[in-house]
């Protein structure tokens, strides 16, 4: 029992956050210039293969789609929120990913994403199949 308490305290001190219920997360509108389509360019250490592509779609209202593709497409809707003063994407699976923007580059889940004009065909198909609640950029 003491080990559980110690581990819990360490997680709190480390700044780890957890979301109990996705639907209770307060959605934050996208800051100016963040709305749009973002995509990896070239190999990324945090993706499973050099051929894998990571994409993030962000609407003005703060709805998101985290779309990763390699041999299949995994597309998770989410929403932007502020956690401990940091802009964070919370997916429906309750995964938390901090978002840092510098010019036309985003740092997201260990990936570097560049602004693009539209999503990949596979991510566009995922958006058609399961549209986000607010209009796309």
Give residue spans per PLM region.
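An anionic, turn-rich surface loop/hairpin at beta-sheet edges
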Residues: 79-99
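N-terminal helix-cap/turn-to-beta initiation motif at the start of protein domains
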Residues: 22-39
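C-terminal motif of bacterial Sec signal peptides marking the signal peptidase cleavage site
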Residues: 12-15
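Bacterial signal peptide processing site
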Residues: 17-20
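C-terminal partner/receptor-binding element of secreted or periplasmic proteins
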Residues: 108-137
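N-terminal glycine/threonine-rich, aromatic-flanked beta-hairpin/loop signature
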Residues: 40-85
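Positively charged n-region of N-terminal signal peptides that target proteins for export
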Residues: 1-4
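Secondary-structure transition/turn motif
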Residues: 68-73, 91-96, 108-117
């Amino acid at each position: 029992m003491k080990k559980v308490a110690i581990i819990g305290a360490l997680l709190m001190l480390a700044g780890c956050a957890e979301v109990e219920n996705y639907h209770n997360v307060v959605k934050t509108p996208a800051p100016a210039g963040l709305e749009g389509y973002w995509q990896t360019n070239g190999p990324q250490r945090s993706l499973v293969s050099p051929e894998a592509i990571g994409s993030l779609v962000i609407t003005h209202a703060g709805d998101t789609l985290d779309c990763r593709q390699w041999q299949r497409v995994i597309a998770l809707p989410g929403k932007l929120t502020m956690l401990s003063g940091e802009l964070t994407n919370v997916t429906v699976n309750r995964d938390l990913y901090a978002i840092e923007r510098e010019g036309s580059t985003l740092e997201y889940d260990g990936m570097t994403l560049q602004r693009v004009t539209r999503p990949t065909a596979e991510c566009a198909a995922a958006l058609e199949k399961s549209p986000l609640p607010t209009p796309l950029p």
